[in-house]
Amino acid sequence: NREAQEYWVAKSFLLLADAYARKGNTFQAKSTLKSVIDNYDKNDDIVPAAKERLQKLK
């Protein structure tokens, strides 16, 4: 199902942002999280999680 696929793709971007942050590449981590926030339009836990991670990077 397409919605499930979109969810897991977005979830993978959150994990990718975590990996960037752990490697010290905060610019790429922030860019990845902002992209998720700007482009993911479902009402579930993805955008709040992205916002929380972004706040921790600032």
Which residue ranges define each predicted feature?
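Acidic, polar-rich low-complexity tracts and alpha-helical solenoid repeat scaffolds
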Residues: 1-58
